[in-house]
Amino acid sequence: MANDVRAADTPREVKAGREQQPREPVTDPALNIDVHPGGQGPPPRHRLVTIGDSLTHGFQSGAVFHTDLSYPAIIADELGWGGHFRYPCYPGYGGLPLNIELLLRELEDRFGQDLDWWETPLALFQARRFMDGAEDYWERGPGAIGPRTTGINHNLSVYGWDLRDVLERTAKTCRDALQAPKDNWLQQVVENHGDRAALRVLPSDSVDGNGRLTLLDAAQRLGNERDDGQEHGIETLIVFLGANNALQAVTQLKVVWSGEGYKDLRGKCSYTVWTPQHFREELEELAERVREIKARHVIWCTVPHVTIAPLARGVAGKTEPGSRYFPYYTRPWISDRDFNPLLHPHLTGQQAEDVDRAIDLYNDAITDQVREARKDGRDWYLMDTAGLLDRLASRRYIEDPLARPTWWQPYPLPPQLQALSPEPNSHFLASDGTRRTDGGLFSLDGVHPTTIGYGILAQELITIMRRAGVEFRHADGSVRPDPVTVDFSRLIRRDTLINQPPGNLTSGLGVLAWAEPTLSLVQRTLYFRAC
């Protein structure tokens, strides 16, 4: 098959791990290594700084928009520091690059919950007009004018960025990539949208006159902004990177292992999965840079298994009883009955397993970095995001007891989420026209969390921060007692996909089945590597 062409290039250490049990999650963030608490006295000036990709940027439903509901912003609110936490904003046309939720609501307002065949031409026209408006706003309108800030953002995250991007990309490289935009009616996508998004994250000219600061440089500057007598300028630094070193295998349904030029900003663009060795080499560079940042506590997050995301849905039943994998993975709007491997894009079950195995090796490397740092006396911690998502994986484990590893236990959702009907799960979101009937943890792009999903991430990180001795405060400044919990009631109210999903997103996902071949939504919203 076409997508098996590079199967011979599968790294030897990945092949050696086939048929092994999945990696067991780390349950002790300190890795059973005691370290003297990283600093005493009042908290440093910058209580929270994050370095990451789309999962930290606040991306959902194909766009970065509600950055005030990213998991870093949620944590900052619970810290009692929300009014000081600086993050980029994308206020127009549902954000960048294309807000699928807003598009579906536009179509629902015009055509109702069901799109009849005779309405298809008008619906196509309406959708293209919406996309043209977004293109005009960000390329030639108010969105084309970047903000001038007087300080460095605390959320230093850019969707689509992998380890190499964080090591090397700057405002200058992003500006150099921008071209004179063209108003193309057929290819309606905001040109260079990733660079435009990054320019709202990176320090502006008023802070960085020559535009040569990387995200790591920016974090280092924050770490150097120390009050008298303090060793650190940052209290907690969260590093959550690596998903984009494997995610394109799922978004493109194609496995191309990294090779020559993988450290080059342009040369790496043809690869969809990094070999574990290449990942380790770049991770070592990243960890060295993080060691230079003056942060009291550092939390590293592991890479989630991207094949669990519902954008790639397993079809044709599990390969055998007790297997974690399906024979094929394709788009969620293609039914088992309709799927044809000769016609439809897909990954094979073996490819999905190989990608997961590579991610397990990435996570072993991240764990090793934390372990060595703790042995050196640094107050570093591990947040095992991969294990968290594994415990929420509906089709892989929850609905198939035979596939569960011996260590597996279901993740206990917070009481406010358990009270929802139906209880949120990792299926693709669906509604009956009036209410949510399935899913709830993943947004409409099938990869990124909903607002409540980001709340779960925030809660796990808050628990680690409390273990590190970080104080969370009420609005009046008083210290919050343990356990410190996220205000999920607030997040539910803000999460429109939970409390009022688009009425045209019915269980068959017919509107997406129409929109994807017609509008190329996945390509427009998730082929967003910085290249």
Where are these regions (language model features)?
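A structural motif corresponding to the C-terminal end of an alpha-helix
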Residues: 222-234, 281-299, 344-384
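Mobile gating loops/cap/lid regions near enzyme active sites that modulate substrate access
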Residues: 305, 311-357, 367-447
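Histidine-centered active-site loop/cap adjacent to the catalytic His
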Residues: 48, 73-75, 235-237, 362, ...
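Sec-exported extracytoplasmic/periplasmic mature domains
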Residues: 56, 60, 76-81, 224, ...
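Catalytic nucleophile-elbow at a beta strand-turn-alpha helix junction centered on a G-D-S/GDSL motif
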Residues: 42-62
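Conserved SGNH/GDSL esterase-like catalytic core that processes O-acyl groups on lipids
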Residues: 17, 21-25, 58-282, 478-531
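Active-site-proximal beta-strand/loop segments in catalytic clefts of secreted hydrolases
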Residues: 51-53, 239-244, 301-305, 385-388, ...
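Helix-enriched interaction subdomains in cytosolic or periplasmic regions
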Residues: 1-23
